[in-house]
C-alpha cells in the first residue's frame, strides 16, 4: 500500500473506502484524501 500519515503516525492509505479492513489488526485511522489512512503499518 501507499504510506500516509495521521499526524506523526505512519499508516497505509486505502483509496475509496471510509473504513479499514478489519482482518489486518489496525488500531486506528484518520480520514485521508478520497479514502482512509490506517495504522499501524502491517
Swiss-Prot record:
Keywords in alphabetical order: Disulfide bond, Ion channel impairing toxin, Nematocyst, Neurotoxin, Secreted, Toxin, Voltage-gated sodium channel impairing toxin
**What InterPro entries does the entry give?**
BDS_K_chnl_tox (IPR012414), Myo_ane_neurotoxin_sf (IPR023355)
SUPFAM superfamilies reported in the protein's UniProt record: Defensin-like
Q: Subcellular localization, per the record?
A: Secreted; Nematocyst
Q: Return the Pfam families for the record.
A: Defensin_4
The protein's superkingdom reads: Eukaryota
Disulfide connectivity for this sequence is 4-37, 6-30, 20-38
Q: Name one GO cellular component term.
A: nematocyst
What GO MF terms are annotated? ion channel inhibitor activity; sodium channel regulator activity; toxin activity
Q: Does the keyword Disulfide bond apply?
A: yes
Query: Any remaining note in the record?
Result: Negative results: has no effect on Nav1.5, Nav1.7 and Nav1.8 sodium channels and on Kv1.1, Kv1.2, Kv1.3, Kv1.4, Kv1.5, Kv1.6, Kv2.1, Kv3.1, Kv4.2, Kv4.3, Kv7.2, Kv7.4, Kv11.1/KCNH2/ERG1, and Shaker potassium channels.
Its family remark reads:
Belongs to the sea anemone type 3 (BDS) potassium channel toxin family.
How are the domains described in the entry?
Has the CSbeta/beta fold, which comprises anti-parallel beta-sheets stabilized by three or four disulfide bonds.
Q: What does this protein do?
A: Binds to voltage-gated sodium channels (Nav), and slows down the inactivation of mammalian Nav1.2/SCN2A, Nav1.3/SCN3A Nav1.4/SCN4A, Nav1.6/SCN8A, insect DmNav1 and BgNav1 channels, and arachnid VdNav1 channel. This toxin acts by binding to site 3 of sodium channels.
Name assigned to this protein: Delta-actitoxin-Ael2d
Q: Which organism is it from?
A: Anthopleura elegantissima
Taxonomic classification, please?
Answer: Eukaryota, Metazoa, Cnidaria, Anthozoa, Hexacorallia
